[in-house]
Amino acid sequence: VRGLAVSQRHPYLFSAGEDKLVKCWDLETNKVVRQYYGHLSGIYALSLHPTLDVLVTAGRDASARVWDMRTKTQIHVLGGHRGTVASVACQEGDPQVITGSMDATIKLWDLAAGRCVTTLTHHKKSVRALALPPHEFTFASGSAGGHNIKRWRCPEGTLMTNMTHEGIVNTLSCNADGVLFSGADDGSMQLFDYATGVPFQSMRDTVQPGSLDAEAGVFCSAFDQTGTRLITGCADKSTYAILTHQRSRSTARHERGELFERERQASEFVGGVLAAVEGDALCHTGEGRS
């Protein structure tokens, strides 16, 4: 299972995985109520539209697909990428759909027409992560190489800021207080001031006993609804809970994040976990079938 999303408008959780399926789970009954068919290969990411009953999925078949959440109808196939679409994000304003691909490009899409309006080619390597800050009309993207985190202005896709995280960035998350988190394939983690692009803290994953040194990668991340707790999923079958103190508005300075909890997951999660935080609930998935 590669992706999770929890609806803010319905009691539904959506999951997507290497089996080319998207499943809709009723959180009140813990049962699958809908399945969405159409991808030709594994699905790597999914995102829910914040105001419409629309689901967007992306995967290894180099496409993103737009679904009617209720009827399971495939509305659009968003083609044009030349490689795996590794990340997707939806927002209320235009562009309502943003995709990042292994072909090192980002595409901004007109949701109503199902067509690409802008292709951003500033990244030199695969774009694996996207993040939408809740406090402003911009987005961030992450890849590998120098200046591998970029901040863009919507709707045009104008480049605003370059940030650097040494390593292959797998995940980005941003909270309403302007803290941007990035996690990389080598286990390194950084916190940035989103407005300025200045890093103010670095951390590193230490692999758990019984895991290989190569299993230090950070695969996914999500802030809780308060924006003060960050959950990360790692390749060594564990999750981090990181306390990111709120920024002081008067001094515009961030306090240092503090690791306050770590949990070792069951042994079947051999490839890492994905996390989504809703209130006090935590969902995580791995390379197993759950």
Report each predicted region and the residues it spans.
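Short coil/turn segments that connect the beta-strands within blades of beta-propeller domains
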Residues: 9-11, 51-53, 93-95, 135-137, ...
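WD40/WD-repeat beta-propeller blade N-cap
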Residues: 1, 37-43, 79-85, 121-127, ...
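Terminal intrinsically disordered, low-complexity extensions flanking WD-repeat/beta-propeller proteins
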Residues: 166-168, 175-179, 187-188, 195-290
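A conserved positional marker within WD40/Gbeta-like beta-propeller blades
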Residues: 12, 21, 32, 40, ...
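A structural motif specific to WD40 beta-propellers
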Residues: 31-34, 73-76, 115-118, 158-161, ...
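WD40-repeat beta-propellers
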Residues: 4, 22-25, 46, 64-68, ...
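Conserved strand-to-loop turn within each blade of WD40 beta-propeller repeats
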Residues: 9, 16-19, 27, 51, ...
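Eukaryotic tandem repeat interaction scaffolds
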Residues: 84-89, 93-185
